[in-house]
């Protein structure tokens, strides 16, 4: 599991965070100062990368939050059997199996054996983002 920690105040829309052990993309961040002596708070709304669930988090701006390190690489489709796609990593030629539910909708129609795809590895899980 490759992650790092950053302050909540450094997050921007479009960045990625880990909420409840699930990697999420930040879709909205709202910062507000609570009062004269209170510290600023941030309300983060994020959508799960793998499950699409909306998650909300409210933390102080100076709190540390876990951010996943996303590794992007190219792979070649070896076979498509039912709901599992078998890929070959073009860096070290290892075989990877990715469930069909972890494929972006716009990439599903263009998947075929021999096609090269861009794969994201987030927290030891794989997602096919696009067909090259």
Curated annotation (Swiss-Prot):
InterPro entries given in the database record: IF5A-like, IF5A-like_N, NA-bd_OB-fold, Rib_uL2_dom2, Trans_elong_IF5A_hypusine_site, Transl_elong_IF5A_arc, Transl_elong_IF5A_C, Translation_prot_SH3-like_sf
One Pfam family cited in the UniProt record for this chain: eIF-5a
Superkingdom of origin: Archaea
Lineage: Archaea, Thermoproteota, Thermoprotei, Thermoproteales, Thermoproteaceae
GO biological process: positive regulation of translational elongation; positive regulation of translational termination
Annotated source species: Pyrobaculum calidifontis (strain DSM 21063 / JCM 11548 / VA1)
Stretches of the chain forming a coiled coil according to its record: none
Hypusine carried by residues: 36
One GO CC term, this protein: cytoplasm
Main location: cytoplasm
GO MF annotation, one: translation initiation factor activity
UniProt function note: Functions by promoting the formation of the first peptide bond.
SMART domains recorded: eIF-5a
SUPFAM superfamilies with a match to the protein in the record: Nucleic acid-binding proteins, Translation proteins SH3-like domain
CDD domains attached to this UniProt entry: S1_aIF5A
Cell location: Cytoplasm
Protein's recorded name: Translation initiation factor 5A
Stated family: Belongs to the eIF-5A family.
Keywords: Cytoplasm, Hypusine, Initiation factor, Protein biosynthesis
């Amino acid at each position: 599991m490759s992650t790092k920690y950053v302050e909540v105040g450094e997050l921007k829309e479009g960045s990625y965070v880990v909420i409840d052990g699930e990697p999420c993309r930040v879709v909205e961040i709202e910062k507000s100062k609570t009062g004269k002596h209170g510290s600023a708070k941030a309300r983060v709304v994020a959508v799960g990368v793998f499950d699409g669930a909306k998650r909300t988090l409210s933390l102080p701006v100076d709190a540390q939050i876990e951010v996943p390190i996303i590794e992007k690489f190219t792979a070649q489709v070896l076979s498509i059997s039912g709901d599992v796609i078998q890929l070959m990593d073009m860096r070290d030629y290892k075989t990877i199996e990715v469930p069909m539910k972890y494929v972006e909708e716009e990439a599903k129609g263009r998947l075929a054996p021999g096609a090269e795809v861009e794969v994201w590895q987030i927290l030891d899980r794989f997602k096919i983002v696009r067909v090259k």
